[in-house]
Curated annotation (Swiss-Prot):
Residues 103-115, 174-185 have a biased composition (Pro residues). Involved in the mineralization and structural organization of enamel. Involved in the extension of enamel during the secretory stage of dental enamel formation. GO terms for cellular component: extracellular matrix; extracellular region. This is Enamelin. GO terms for molecular function: structural constituent of tooth enamel. It comes from Mus musculus.
Length: 1274
């Protein structure tokens, strides 16, 4: 330190005065060189552990150190003296070459001695040779404007490094003999070597990265990074991490060849190996690192060598940034080329950080994260664009000084950057001219220095590759250390982009579990959302979200959300689930402002089912991201609502900007601002009130159709009950998160799964709205119905439709219009809603007619379902969602609505994300079919099993169970509304239906024998009870629904997709899949349902089969039914699945209804009821009339009966077998559904006529089990 002090305070002669100049030079050089060589090695070693990048960079820069860069670095330091560059390069290479190369110093000891005085001269001369000095000093000055802070910081950093090691900046050790003054100058030299960095891309021994702030700068920068992360500069140092490449870029900038070569190699290196690998993640990582661990990126950036140098370069980088944002094709290419990661880079890495993460991290994330991200990609420049100025310091890690004179160093970077490029031609030409000596470091040094930056990219660029392993690895390697913040943070930061998405992106990881999974998942997912969304919406998040995403975090989240919904929607980003989640979470806050806070909370909870974070309604705004919700909520209509409650359509309005689909959708019923989400409520008869909107983002029209009716009235009037139900719907939405996937297929199917369109067509509108109309008949939704008057055509149609099928046909039209809208879903959902609603009336009225017999039967379904609805608001909807979403059922039932939403939805969201993607496709089909058919015969839901789904009656048939579970989960009251009103007008008094039937329905009568979770799906439960819970014999009859052998394979795929979708699909699907002869019936079921759906168009009974299959197969309730009604293995299996967590809870939560409905029947329902049904078949038929009126069980049993009944099944079996690519087993189920439909027709008529015996007789073939189901109902 004495030497340093002597040298530092005094010009080199003074150290020479202390010691003979030669001795001093030798001692200082040898000591400093040895220490610097040793110390940088030592320091790199510590930094290596701490900052892989830095240590590696240091090591690499140690390579630099002995490379020409050190001589250049002295040149830079002497250049700090400023006169040095031209003269110094020759002298430096001789003098400093000895200095830098450990071997040389002995030979060069004397030359250094002369050079010491000469170095003072050289410093002057160097400043002179840096004829760019006018430029360089200006760049320095300009940088010094900002660098004063940076330089001061660099000084502080450099000076502390001076004390830290005598050569505080790894650079100093080398140049310190020349830098006695420059050392204090060096921070200033950093200010000035900034252009020395420009020139010397030693950037104070940029090559040695002693100039990087010196390695000691690394050492300190390690601290500095840690400190600066606290400062706001960490993002700026994040920029320097991008500037790690920027040094190369700086070199690149300085040396045009180096710039092109280095930048390209660096970019290429970074882009392909690291840009993609490190930067790709680091694009995400760095942002996150910047976000969370900006210090390490900062360190990386600083480690990159010249935080202070970065100052000038940041100005330079701003140009790069301007070029880079997208212009930087290396960066852009990486970002975009690494579409997947690139989206991370592109959206997450670059755009996401800016847009997606930027919004979250915004200032620092944008600043540092972008910088880091681009810097990570080795495009210090692309990051610079991301960073803005972040990469202004790209060559020089001036990303730190990114905000300040950096821009001057964009202006001055034309000057300074031109010193970096121009002065680098001048200065860099010294480092190109002198880089024969100096520029050989930049070319030699690019072989040396640029090789540091290329060699050093092996060294420095390897820091950018190595250091990207080191520096980029800082962004991965030093990100183990610094970039571990950038990778720790990249685990933190990239993981923030995944990890810090755990951290920052954990907001985006909560989201990015959904969102970070989007950002990782979503960068796979969010990044894919932001890939997907960034492809579309994340690009909006990049572009629009530069505008919109910047705001996006706030409200553009809503805007972004819808847009992403549209994007994700069209992209059918199942990954966007995660992505979308991230977005969802982002959107959460906007969604949060949805009119229904509880629903918003639910939505948010729903949308962030995986992330409990969204629970905070603000958080769930992210889910409002339709890119996420579009996935999740799109997949799950309820999730959509959860993401953006229908009430939150205002948020959807916010989302609407992004969710273009939402905008049109919600436009049709903008009065129901929240309604757009209903669009997803294809299967949201119950939930659409609250959840459909978010989920229906893709189907705003459907959702709007639904939500207008359902959501507003429930939200407004049934707020307590309906809202509670909607909470269930919201959680049903989350439960519908599987539905979400289900709905997402709507979203996607809008684009991808058009088959789901039938479902969506019917489901969103018919399902939700007809149910709402029916439910409107119910006390709950009567209010809603009044408020539904926006959609009153459907409401009245439903209520009126129930009496008149043309009304149902209208609703069917509406519902199919919804599907049409669903086609529009992305865009014109609302408009097509009513419009297409009528067109579908034309096509579907026949189905309603076909369903008309079931219309009479349908009242039972509504009745049965309605009882589900009635209790459902509080318990039944939880039960239904729970039953439907077995995982969710418990929470819903236990926690009236919200707990279930949270419980099952979180779990189910993951499950639905897992399973829903495959299943929502099928479910979309099923829902399309079921809802479509059901919607067609809104009260002939019985006629078309699918119709059961669309409407509560259909829901009640067991499809209704599933969909109603979804709906019930989302809008249990709505479902009550729909089902009950429809049912009430015909079969039961509202009060009776509501109270009595609800419980009966909730019991799922026979079906809920296993589990009461199917309150709404009583039909489905009964269906499934016959199928699932009923003994194998009952399963024979129930086979259409859940006959393990036949219907499970057939209907069950339908069931699971449509009914079991969210939770039960996971549970029932898993169980039934495990237990079912056709474990992959869902896989088959989707094709079957889809096939059947086409056949549904062709053959309503086939559709009914599909629908019934789905009704059976839609086993949210069926799952409990499976559980309990399967009396044996299935119930046990499902019970194992459900009971531990949800069945018991569900039973507890649904005790009033579930116990009343099916829990008592669980044990006895399958066996006892079967025995009773067999023993008391006639007796039960007579007893059954009240129960028989619970045709849902008949629907199921009818299916089962059809399944058992050979002739009807056989008659239709070939059709369905042919029509539905179902296994013969599935075929019987389908046939059962057909037979059931026919039977249900007659039974329904009889039932409407109160001819229960006739109904029983119709089911008499199935009586033992049908009656068992009926008995359970009774």
């Amino acid at each position: 330190m004495l030497l340093l002090q002597c040298r530092n305070p005094t010009s080199p002669p003074k150290p020479c005065g202390l010691v003979p100049n030669v001795k001093m030079s030798l001692l200082v050089f040898l000591g400093l060189l040895g220490v610097s060589a040793a110390m940088p090695f030592q320091m790199p070693m510590p930094r290596m552990p701490g900052f892989s990048s830095k240590s590696e960079e240091m090591m690499r820069y140690n390579q630099f150190n002995f490379m020409n860069a050190p001589p250049m670095m002295p040149m830079g330091p002497y250049g700090n003296g400023m006169p040095m560059p031209p003269h110094m390069p020759p002298q430096y290479p001789p003098y400093q070459m000895p200095m830098w190369p450990p071997p040389v110093p002995n030979g060069w000891q004397q030359p250094p001695m002369p050079n010491f005085p000469s170095k003072t001269d050289q410093t002057q001369e160097t400043a002179k040779p840096n004829q760019t000095n006018p430029q360089e000093p200006q760049p320095q000055k300009q940088p010094l404007k900002e660098p004063p802070n940076e330089a001061a910081r660099a000084k502080d950093d450099a000076q502390p490094p001076q004390p830290f090691p005598p050569f505080g900046n790894g650079l100093y050790p080398y140049p310190q003999p020349p830098w006695p003054i420059p050392q204090r100058g060096p921070p200033t030299a950093f200010g000035r070597p900034k252009f020395s960095n420009e020139e010397g891309n030693p950037y104070y021994a940029f090559f040695g990265y002693h100039g990087f702030g010196g390695r000691p700068y690394y050492s300190e920068e390690m601290f500095e990074d840690y400190e600066k992360p606290k400062e706001k500069d960490p993002p700026k140092p994040e920029d320097p991490p991008p500037d790690d490449p920027p040094p190369e870029a700086s070199t690149n900038s300085t040396v045009p060849d180096a710039n092109a070569t280095q930048s390209i190699p660096e970019g290429g290196n970074d882009t392909s190996p690291i840009g993609n690998t490190g930067p790709g993640p680091n694009a995400g990582n760095n942002p996150t690192v910047q976000n969370g661990v900006f210090p390490p990126p900062k360190v990386n950036v600083s480690g990159q060598g010249v935080p202070k140098s970065q100052i000038p370069w940041r100005p330079s980088q701003p140009n790069i940034y301007e070029n880079y944002p997208y212009p930087n094709y290396p960066s852009e290419r990486q970002w975009q080329t690494t579409g997947t990661q690139g989206p991370r880079q592109n959206g997450p890495g670059y755009r996401n950080p800016q847009v997606e993460r930027g919004p979250q991290w915004n200032s620092f994330a944008w600043e540092g994260k972008q910088a880091t991200r681009p810097g990570n990609p080795t495009y210090g420049k692309p990051p610079s664009p991301t960073s803005g100025v972040n990469y202004a310091g790209n060559p020089v890690h001036f990303g730190r000084n990114l905000p300040g004179p950096n821009k001057p160093f964009v202006g001055a970077n034309p000057a300074s950057n031109k010193p970096f490029v121009g002065a680098n031609p001048a200065s860099n030409k010294p480092f190109v001219g002198a880089n024969p000596a100096s520029n050989k470091p930049f070319v030699g040094a690019n072989p040396a220095s640029n090789k540091p930056f290329v060699g050093a990219n092996p060294a420095s660029n390897k820091p950018y590759v190595g250091a990207n392993p080191a520096s980029n690895k800082p962004f991965i390697g030093a990100n183990p250390a610094a970039n571990k913040p950038s990778i720790g943070t990249n685990p933190a930061a990239n993981k923030p982009s995944i990890g810090t998405n755990p951290a920052a992106n954990k907001p985006f990881v909560r989201n990015n579990v959904g969102a970070n999974k989007p950002f990782v998942g979503t960068n796979p997912s969010s990044n894919q959302p932001f890939l997907r969304s960034n492809q579309a919406s994340n690009k909006p998040f990049m572009r629009s979200n530069q505008a919109s995403n910047k705001p996006f975090v706030g409200t553009n989240v809503a805007s972004v959300g819808p847009k992403q919904v549209t994007v994700s929607h069209n992209m059918k980003t199942q990954n966007p689930k995660e992505k979308s989640l991230g977005q969802k979470e982002r959107t959460v806050t906007p969604t949060k402002d949805a009119s229904n806070p509880w629903r918003s909370a639910k939505q948010y909870g729903i949308n962030n089912p995986n992330y409990n974070l969204p629970r905070s309604e603000g958080s769930m705004v992210g889910p409002n991201f339709n890119s996420f919700d579009q996935q999740e909520n799109s997949y799950f209509s309820k999730g959509a609502s959860k993401r953006v409650p229908s009430p939150n359509i205002q948020i959807q309005s916010q989302n609407l900007p992004k969710g273009i689909a939402l905008e049109p959708r919600r436009t049709p019923f903008q009065s129901e601002t929240k309604k757009p989400e209903l669009k997803h409520g294809t299967h949201q008869p119950a939930y659409p009130k609250k959840i459909p909107s978010p989920t229906r983002k893709h189907f705003p029209a459907e959702r709007n159709t639904w939500n207008r009716q359902k959501i507003l009235p429930p939200l407004k009037e049934d707020y307590g009950r309906q809202d509670e139900n909607l909470r269930h719907p919201s959680y049903g939405s989350r439960g519908n998160i599987f539905y979400h996937e289900y709905t997402n297929p709507y979203h996607n199917e809008k684009s991808q799964y058009i088959k789901s369109n039938p479902w969506d067509k019917s489901s969103p509108s018919t399902m939700m709205r007809p149910e709402n109309p029916q439910y409107t008949m119910t006390s709950l939704d009567q209010k809603e119905t009044e408020q539904y008057n926006e959609e009153d055509p459907i409401d009245p149609n439903e209520d009126e439709s129930f009496p008149g099928q043309s009304r149902w046909g209208d609703e069917e039209m509406n519902f199919k219009g919804n599907p049409t809208v669903r086609q529009y879903e992305g865009e014109h959902y609302a408009s097509t809603l009513a419009k297409e609603y009528l067109p579908y009336s034309l096509s579907n009225p026949p189905k309603p007619s076909e369903d008309f017999p079931y219309s009479e039967f349908y009242p039972w379904n509504p009745q049965e379902t309605f009882p589900i609805y009635n209790p459902g608001p509080t318990i039944a909807p939880p039960v239904d969602p729970r039953s439907y979403y077995v995982n969710n059922a418990i929470g819903q039932e236990e926690s009236t609505l919200f707990p279930s939403w949270t419980s099952w939805d979180h779990r189910n969201q993951a499950e639905r994300q897992k399973e829903s993607e495959p299943y929502f496709n099928r479910n979309v089909w099923d829902q399309s079919i079921n809802l479509h058919k059901s919607n067609i015969p809104n009260h002939p839901y019985s006629t078309t099993s699918p119709a059961r789904f669309p409407k509560d009656p259909t829901w009640f048939e067991g499809e209704n169970l599933n969909y109603d579970l979804q709906i019930t989960s989302l809008s249990p009251p709505e479902r009550e509304q729909l089902a009950f009103p429809d049912f009430l007008p015909q079969s039961y008094p509202t009060g009776q239906n509501e109270a009595h039937l609800f419980h009966q329905s909730q019991r799922g009568s026979c079906c809920i024998g296993g589990s009461t979770g199917h309150k709404d799906n009583v039909l489905a439960l009964q269906d499934y009870t016959s199928s699932y819970g009923l003994p194998p014999r009952k399963n024979q009859e129930t086979s259409p629904v859940h006959t393990e052998s036949s219907y499970i394979k057939y209907a069950r795929p339908n069931v699971s997709p449509a009914s079991i979708l969210p939770s039960q699909r996971n549970i029932s699907e898993n169980k039934l899949t495990a237990e079912s002869p056709n474990p992959s019936p869902f896989g088959d079921g989707v094709p079957t349902v889809r096939k059947n759906t086409p056949y549904s168009g062709k053959n309503q009974l086939e559709t009914g089969i599909v629908a019934f299959s789905e009704a059976s197969s839609s086993q949210p309730k069926n799952t409990p039914c499976l559980k309990s009604d399967l009396g044996g293995d299935r119930r046990d299996v499902l019970k194992q699945f459900f009971e531990g967590s949800q069945l018991s809870e569900r039973t507890a939560g649904l005790t009033p209804e579930q116990l009343v409905i099916g829990i008592p029947d669980k044990g006895s329902g399958p066996d006892s009821i079967q025995s009773e049904v067999q023993g008391k078949e006639g007796e039960m038929q007579q007893q059954r009339p009240p129960t028989i009126m619970k045709l849902p069980c008949f629907g199921s049993n009818s299916k089962f009966h059809s399944s058992t009944t050979g002739p009807p099944i056989n008659n239709r079996r070939p059709t369905l077998l042919n029509g539905a690519l179902s296994t013969p087993t599935e075929s019987p189920n389908t046939l059962v559904g057909l037979a059931t439909r026919e039977q249900l027709k007659s039974i329904n008529v009889d039932k409407l006529n109160a001819d229960e015996h006739t109904t029983l007789e119709s089911f008499q073939g199935t009586s033992p089990q049908d009656q068992g189901c009926l008995l359970l109902q009774a």
